[in-house]
């Protein structure tokens, strides 16, 4: 018996699938998981720069300023504002003379 006779057989001048297992819940679950996987893969490829940049740089918020005096908080804010975004999250401090 060949694979062709097990999967597809000619039915009244058309090709059809003679699968009785298509109502099996395992087959339905596998189909849903496969479709979800494909959708997530496509979204990942479309938005990978945005997603991974957000994960890599968005979670790094710097040290907490809780418990510090207001003067030290202001100094920290000024240092952060003096940093200039050069390329893809790489920072450089610019000092004016």
Swiss-Prot record:
Q: What InterPro entries is this protein classified in? A: Flu_M2
Q: Which residues cross the membrane?
A: 23-43
Q: Name one GO biological process term.
A: symbiont-mediated suppression of host autophagy
Site residues, Seems to be involved in pH gating: 41
Virion surface membrane side = 1-22
Q: Please indicate which residues carry the site annotation Essential for channel activity, possibly by being protonated during channel activation, and by forming the channel gate and the selective filter.
A: 37
User: Which residues are recorded as modified (Phosphoserine)?
Assistant: 64, 82
This protein's record includes keyword Transport: yes
Pfam hit, one: Flu_M2
Q: What else is known?
A: When the channel is activated, one or more imidazole moieties of His-37 probably become bi-protonated.
Function description: Forms a proton-selective ion channel that is necessary for the efficient release of the viral genome during virus entry. After attaching to the cell surface, the virion enters the cell by endocytosis. Acidification of the endosome triggers M2 ion channel activity.
Q: What is known of its domains?
A: Cytoplasmic tail plays an important role in virion assembly and morphogenesis.
Can you state the subunit structure given in the record?
A: Homotetramer; composed of two disulfide-linked dimers held together by non-covalent interactions. May interact with matrix protein 1.
Name of the protein in its database record? Matrix protein 2
Q: Which organism is it from?
A: Influenza A virus (strain A/Swine/May/1954 H1N1)
């Amino acid at each position: 018996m060949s694979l062709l006779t097990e999967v597809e057989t000619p039915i009244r001048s058309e090709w059809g699938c003679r699968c009785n297992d298509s109502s099996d819940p395992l087959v339905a679950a596998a189909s849903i998981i496969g479709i979800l996987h494909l959708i997530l893969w496509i979204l990942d490829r479309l938005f990978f720069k945005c997603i991974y940049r957000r994960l890599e740089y968005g979670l790094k918020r710097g040290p907490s300023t809780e418990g510090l005096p207001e003067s030290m908080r202001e100094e920290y804010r000024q240092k952060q504002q003096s940093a200039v975004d050069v390329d893809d999250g790489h920072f450089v401090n610019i000092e004016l003379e």
